[in-house]
Amino acid sequence: MKRIGILGAGTWGMALARMLTVSGNDVLVWSAIEKEIDSLSTTRKHPNLPQMKIPDELRFTKSIEEVCKDKDILLFAVPSVFVRSTAAKARPYVADGQIIVDVAKGIEPDTLYTMTEILADELGKEGCLLYTSDAADEL
Protein backbone atom coordinates (compact mmCIF):
# COMPACT_ATOMS: atom_id res chain seq x y z
CA MET A 1 0.00 0.00 0.00
CA LYS A 2 1.30 3.42 -0.99
CA ARG A 3 0.50 6.63 0.86
CA ILE A 4 -0.61 9.11 -1.80
CA GLY A 5 -1.37 12.81 -1.47
CA ILE A 6 -3.43 14.33 -4.27
CA LEU A 7 -3.36 18.09 -4.66
CA GLY A 8 -6.52 19.02 -6.52
CA ALA A 9 -10.09 17.73 -6.25
CA GLY A 10 -11.35 18.40 -9.76
CA THR A 11 -12.63 15.66 -12.04
CA TRP A 12 -9.19 14.34 -12.95
CA GLY A 13 -7.87 14.42 -9.38
CA MET A 14 -10.97 12.75 -7.99
CA ALA A 15 -11.13 10.08 -10.69
CA LEU A 16 -7.50 9.18 -9.96
CA ALA A 17 -8.11 9.36 -6.20
CA ARG A 18 -10.98 6.89 -6.48
CA MET A 19 -9.02 4.52 -8.71
CA LEU A 20 -5.97 4.61 -6.42
CA THR A 21 -8.13 4.09 -3.32
CA VAL A 22 -10.01 1.07 -4.68
CA SER A 23 -6.62 -0.34 -5.70
CA GLY A 24 -5.73 -0.51 -2.01
CA ASN A 25 -3.75 2.68 -1.49
CA ASP A 26 -4.06 5.18 1.36
CA VAL A 27 -5.20 8.34 -0.45
CA LEU A 28 -5.66 11.84 0.93
CA VAL A 29 -7.06 14.65 -1.27
CA TRP A 30 -6.52 18.40 -0.79
CA SER A 31 -8.18 21.35 -2.49
CA ALA A 32 -7.52 25.06 -2.16
CA ILE A 33 -11.30 25.48 -2.18
CA GLU A 34 -12.40 24.63 1.36
CA LYS A 35 -16.11 24.43 0.44
CA GLU A 36 -15.21 21.79 -2.14
CA ILE A 37 -13.56 19.65 0.55
CA ASP A 38 -16.58 20.11 2.84
CA SER A 39 -18.97 19.04 0.07
CA LEU A 40 -16.92 16.02 -1.04
CA SER A 41 -16.50 14.85 2.56
CA THR A 42 -20.20 15.20 3.31
CA THR A 43 -21.91 14.07 0.10
CA ARG A 44 -19.25 11.57 -1.10
CA LYS A 45 -20.11 12.76 -4.63
CA HIS A 46 -18.35 15.02 -7.13
CA PRO A 47 -20.69 17.42 -8.96
CA ASN A 48 -19.03 16.77 -12.33
CA LEU A 49 -18.86 12.99 -11.86
CA PRO A 50 -22.39 12.20 -10.63
CA GLN A 51 -22.13 8.45 -11.32
CA MET A 52 -18.93 8.06 -9.29
CA LYS A 53 -19.26 6.96 -5.67
CA ILE A 54 -16.42 8.18 -3.51
CA PRO A 55 -15.14 5.28 -1.39
CA ASP A 56 -15.46 5.68 2.37
CA GLU A 57 -11.71 5.01 2.67
CA LEU A 58 -10.85 8.08 0.57
CA ARG A 59 -10.02 10.95 2.89
CA PHE A 60 -9.97 14.73 2.46
CA THR A 61 -8.04 17.59 4.04
CA LYS A 62 -7.92 21.36 3.95
CA SER A 63 -4.24 21.29 5.01
CA ILE A 64 -1.58 21.35 2.33
CA GLU A 65 0.93 20.23 4.97
CA GLU A 66 -1.14 17.15 5.80
CA VAL A 67 -1.60 16.14 2.16
CA CYS A 68 2.17 16.31 1.57
CA LYS A 69 3.59 15.00 4.83
CA ASP A 70 4.59 11.32 5.12
CA LYS A 71 3.43 10.44 1.60
CA ASP A 72 5.20 8.14 -0.84
CA ILE A 73 3.68 9.89 -3.84
CA LEU A 74 2.43 13.45 -4.40
CA LEU A 75 0.12 13.81 -7.37
CA PHE A 76 -0.47 17.35 -8.63
CA ALA A 77 -3.92 17.50 -10.24
CA VAL A 78 -4.59 21.22 -10.23
CA PRO A 79 -5.29 23.26 -13.38
CA SER A 80 -2.11 24.35 -15.14
CA VAL A 81 -2.56 28.00 -14.13
CA PHE A 82 -2.31 26.93 -10.47
CA VAL A 83 0.60 24.46 -10.68
CA ARG A 84 3.28 27.01 -9.73
CA SER A 85 1.38 28.56 -6.82
CA THR A 86 0.34 25.14 -5.49
CA ALA A 87 3.91 23.83 -5.72
CA ALA A 88 5.18 26.93 -3.90
CA LYS A 89 2.70 26.31 -1.07
CA ALA A 90 3.64 22.62 -0.93
CA ARG A 91 7.42 23.19 -1.09
CA PRO A 92 8.06 23.35 2.69
CA TYR A 93 6.40 19.95 3.14
CA VAL A 94 7.87 18.01 0.20
CA ALA A 95 10.42 15.47 1.41
CA ASP A 96 13.36 13.76 -0.22
CA GLY A 97 12.39 10.47 -1.76
CA GLN A 98 8.81 11.41 -2.56
CA ILE A 99 7.67 10.62 -6.08
CA ILE A 100 6.18 13.69 -7.76
CA VAL A 101 3.56 13.17 -10.48
CA ASP A 102 1.83 15.88 -12.50
CA VAL A 103 -1.35 15.37 -14.52
CA ALA A 104 -1.89 18.96 -15.69
CA LYS A 105 -1.36 19.78 -19.35
CA GLY A 106 -0.03 23.01 -20.70
CA ILE A 107 2.77 25.52 -20.92
CA GLU A 108 3.34 28.45 -18.57
CA PRO A 109 2.98 31.56 -20.78
CA ASP A 110 5.67 33.71 -19.12
CA THR A 111 8.42 31.07 -19.00
CA LEU A 112 7.28 28.55 -21.62
CA TYR A 113 7.91 25.86 -18.99
CA THR A 114 5.99 22.61 -19.06
CA MET A 115 4.18 21.64 -15.87
CA THR A 116 6.96 19.24 -14.84
CA GLU A 117 9.53 21.99 -15.40
CA ILE A 118 7.50 24.26 -13.12
CA LEU A 119 7.44 21.56 -10.44
CA ALA A 120 11.21 21.07 -10.77
CA ASP A 121 11.71 24.84 -10.54
CA GLU A 122 9.50 25.22 -7.46
CA LEU A 123 10.27 21.97 -5.64
CA GLY A 124 13.91 21.53 -6.62
CA LYS A 125 13.32 17.96 -7.77
CA GLU A 126 12.29 16.16 -10.92
CA GLY A 127 8.83 14.76 -11.36
CA CYS A 128 7.03 12.68 -13.93
CA LEU A 129 4.06 13.38 -16.10
CA LEU A 130 0.89 11.39 -16.65
CA TYR A 131 -0.97 12.46 -19.78
CA THR A 132 -4.17 11.06 -21.17
CA SER A 133 -7.42 12.29 -22.61
CA ASP A 134 -9.66 14.37 -20.39
CA ALA A 135 -11.97 11.40 -19.93
CA ALA A 136 -11.96 11.33 -16.12
CA ASP A 137 -15.41 9.76 -16.15
CA GLU A 138 -13.94 6.72 -17.93
CA LEU A 139 -11.73 5.85 -14.97
Predicted segments with their positions:
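Short glycine/serine/threonine-rich phosphate/pyrophosphate-binding segments
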Residues: 13-16, 82-86, 112
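Rossmann-fold NAD(P)-binding glycine/threonine-rich loop
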Residues: 106-127
